[in-house]
Curated annotation (Swiss-Prot):
Name of this protein: NAD(P)H-quinone oxidoreductase subunit 6, chloroplastic
Role played: NDH shuttles electrons from NAD(P)H:plastoquinone, via FMN and iron-sulfur (Fe-S) centers, to quinones in the photosynthetic chain and possibly in a chloroplast respiratory chain. The immediate electron acceptor for the enzyme in this species is believed to be plastoquinone. Couples the redox reaction to proton translocation, and thus conserves the redox energy in a proton gradient.
GO CC annotation: chloroplast thylakoid membrane
GN (gene name): ndhG
Subunit structure of this chain's protein: NDH is composed of at least 16 different subunits, 5 of which are encoded in the nucleus.
Entry's family note: Belongs to the complex I subunit 6 family.
Organism: Gossypium hirsutum (Upland cotton)
UniProt catalytic activity: a plastoquinone + NADH + (n+1) H(+)(in) = a plastoquinol + NAD(+) + n H(+)(out); a plastoquinone + NADPH + (n+1) H(+)(in) = a plastoquinol + NADP(+) + n H(+)(out)
InterPro entries named in the record: NAD(P)H-Q_Oxidoreduct_6 (IPR050290), NADH_UbQ/plastoQ_OxRdtase_su6 (IPR001457), Nuo/plastoQ_OxRdtase_6_NuoJ (IPR042106)
EC number from the UniProt entry: 7.1.1.-
Major location category of this protein: plastid
Keyword check for Plastid: yes
Top-level taxon: Eukaryota
Length: 176
């Protein structure tokens, strides 16, 4: 989106705070329905980030697939579960929770240090979209594939990783 600088900065801060508050809501709220709604807020904020970065197709796919389908499916599954099983044997902190928290925190710290230490300007992309001539013979689906493989490669990979994590989480919940 071509917005003036202060408006763009305000929207970035507003969406970033929405992401942080929604993420905290997903983790800290004890009612799983409220957590699912907080997850919907996070996914909508991510989609709005894509709109701010002129990735309209990725934003539409984010809204349709994640907010429209996966979040509704999570809400549907949570509403069918027995609500009383969430509050039985409620322990505030266990050794497994502490170990999991320690592992996740160490992964987060290592990712942050890796991202900050990487020289992003030194990365040379082998294929750029301005080198690919989009002819009239190329169909729309091929153009979308070209853009996903060049311009929107990182957002596409982030979405696939998020989908993989959601799938692993669904399998873990289903096994219990």
């Amino acid at each position: 989106m071509d917005l003036p600088g202060p408006i763009h900065d305000f929207l970035l801060v507003f969406l970033g705070s929405g992401l942080i508050l929604g993420g905290l809501g997903v983790v800290l709220l004890t009612n799983p329905i409220y957590s699912a709604f907080s997850l919907g807020l996070v996914l909508v904020c991510i989609s709005l980030f894509y709109i701010l970065s002129n990735s309209h197709f990725v934003a539409a796919a984010q809204l349709l697939i994640y907010v429209g389908a996966i979040n509704v499916l999570i809400l549907f599954a949570v509403m069918f579960m027995n609500g009383s099983e969430y509050y039985k044997d409620f322990n505030l902190w266990t050794i497994g929770n502490g170990l999991t928290s320690l592992v996740c925190t160490s992964i987060l710290v290592s990712l942050i240090t890796t991202i900050l230490d990487t020289s992003w300007y030194g990365i040379i992309w082998t294929t750029r979209s301005n080198q690919i001539i989009e002819q009239d013979l190329i169909s729309n689906s091929q153009q979308i594939g070209i853009h996903l493989a060049t311009d929107f490669f990182l957002p596409f990979e982030f979405i696939s990783i998020i989908l993989l994590v959601a799938l692993i989480g669904a399998i873990a919940v289903a096994r219990q």
